[in-house]
C-alpha cells in the first residue's frame, strides 16, 4: 500500500525538485559510507506480536472496527517533516479536546493528505485502513526515538547523525538530499544500462542524492544520481529509497494490555 505520503520515491522526487533541494555545489569529496541499523529491543512480547498480527488481518479485510478497537483511550500524534530528521525530537500535537483514541486515528489519517477537506465517514475509514497498511507493510518493528521510546511499526533507522551530516557536507548537498537505499543497488558511470558499474551499495546505505530524475542516454528509463563514497557521480534506475521517518503506528501497554498509543505522520 502506497496510496499516502508514504510513497518515499514520490516524496523524494517532490523534495528533490523543490527549491530547497540542490544539486551538489562545488567538487564532491570522498566520504565514509554509512549503513543504518534497526533495533528490535522489546519486540518479542507474545501479546504484542498477537496484536500486530490481528492488525495485519484487519488491514487485509478492511476491518476498520478492529483497527479502531486497538486504539488506547489516548493516542498521541507526532507530525514530522519528510527528509532528514531535526536534531530536536518533536512533541506530540496538542489535543485540547481530549478526543478518544479512535477519533485520534481519524485525525492522524486526515494528516496524511493535503488540504483542509471535510471527509465522509467512509473516506476516513478507508484512510485509517491505508494508514495502518502503510505502517505495517514493511513488516518491521522496533523502538522509536520520535515516539519517546514506544515500539512502532515500521522500525526506525538507527544511525550516527553527525556522520550522516558529514556525508551531505562531503557531497556538497543539503541534508534534505540524504535518503536510505531500500535494497542493494548498482550505480553506473552514466544513465545507461550499458555503462560500467562504479559501485554496489548495500541496502540501508545512506546516500546523498544529486538529482532525483535524470533522463537516460537512450531517452528512456527513470534514472537518478547520487554522490558515491568515492566522490564520483553514480546513476541508478527506479528510485525506491526510503526516508528517515515513515508513517508509523506505535504500541504501548495500557492497563496491562497492548494497544495503539501513538501515530507518526510525516508530511511535506
Regions inferred by a protein language model and the residue ranges of each:
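Bacterial N-terminal signal peptides that target proteins for export
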Residues: 1-9
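Short, well-ordered alpha-helical segments enriched in acidic and aromatic residues
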Residues: 63-74
